[in-house]
């Protein structure tokens, strides 16, 4: 179990995370759609996740979404590193009705994000461009490489939810147990 607290002038965040959980979550960021996505992330990755954020959402959702990504990435890093006895690489495609998004992951200590989802538009009052900000913060603080590739879809909610679910399933697969030690020819990650 990892617990991280982070407080800035813009947000106050607490994250509790157990990667070998059962998918339970307790999420409260003040941003309803974002809470829904984090619940999906926990459920489909199998991790237990608590996220509480008191952010300046009266200004914009940006600080809340970005900072939750930072803290969640740090918590995942603390849970996983040093890397050993995991698969390391994984991918998944989750569909939601007409939408499909593929996520490819490398839990390899080298942060990189390829992001190919639509960035324009709103889901109620949630700006689509915030999805990229969240994943960018998460990926760089977790120190993983992720390719998040839009395959098809027209409903923005479905597209984003497909991305979160695909990320969750790929993460669960990448973190699955492997007996052979450190999954790298370098001998270290």
From Swiss-Prot:
Source domain of life = Bacteria
Catalytic reaction equation(s)? D-erythro-1-(imidazol-4-yl)glycerol 3-phosphate = 3-(imidazol-4-yl)-2-oxopropyl phosphate + H2O
Keyword terms, alphabetized: Amino-acid biosynthesis, Cytoplasm, Histidine biosynthesis, Lyase
Q: Does the keyword Heme apply?
A: no
Q: Where is this chain's protein located in or outside the cell? A: Cytoplasm
One Pfam family hit: IGPD
Q: Which molecular function GO terms apply here?
A: imidazoleglycerol-phosphate dehydratase activity
EC number assigned by the record = 4.2.1.19
Q: Reply yes or no: does the keyword Amino-acid biosynthesis apply.
A: yes
Protein's UniProt name: Imidazoleglycerol-phosphate dehydratase
Which species does the entry assign this protein to?
Nautilia profundicola (strain ATCC BAA-1463 / DSM 18972 / AmH)
Query: What gene does the UniProt entry assign to this protein?
Result: hisB
């Amino acid at each position: 179990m990892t617990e991280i607290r982070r407080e800035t002038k813009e947000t106050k965040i607490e994250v509790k995370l157990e990667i070998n959980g059962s998918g339970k979550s307790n999420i409260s960021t003040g941003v309803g759609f974002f809470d829904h996505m984090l619940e999906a992330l926990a459920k489909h990755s199998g991790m237990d996740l608590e996220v509480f954020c008191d952010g300046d959402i009266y200004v914009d959702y940006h600080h809340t979404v970005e900072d939750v990504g930072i803290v969640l990435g740090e918590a995942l890093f603390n849970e996983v590193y040093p890397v050993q006895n995991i698969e390391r690489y994984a991918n998944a495609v989750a569909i939601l009705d007409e939408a499909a998004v593929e996520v490819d992951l490398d839990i390899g200590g080298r942060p990189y994000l390829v992001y190919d989802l639509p960035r324009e538009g709103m889901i109620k009052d949630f700006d689509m461009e915030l999805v990229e900000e969240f994943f960018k913060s998460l990926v760089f603080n977790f120190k993983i490489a992720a390719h998040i590739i839009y395959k098809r879809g027209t409903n923005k909610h479905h597209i984003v939810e497909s991305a979160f679910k695909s990320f969750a399933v790929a993460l669960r697969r990448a973190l699955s147990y492997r007996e052979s030690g450190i999954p790298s020819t370098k001998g270290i990650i």
